[in-house]
């Protein structure tokens, strides 16, 4: 598996955002929130990131936070690809920028929690 984040792995289109916010579940580790939903027909996870303008008004800071979250996900996406694929959408809810090491730690925690929730769901489905 490569460490890239190709275009076909990016979350795009109204359909997926509608499904995510209607049926998706969320995991929170302030200031990051992960909204996820399973996508049975997917061959890899679909990924998206958002930093609201209301929380971070300066575009330069918003873009930097988005780049940091994308990079942390790109390097750690193998954690989330262990069981089944889904749509993953990260939302930055803080008002202040964090160092990259903290963002990477939060992304790892969220991906591990996502993995655990998928495992629990699969165990319940088998019973």
Regions found by a protein language model. Name each.
Residues 1-127:
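Positively charged, solvent-exposed patches that mediate nucleic-acid binding
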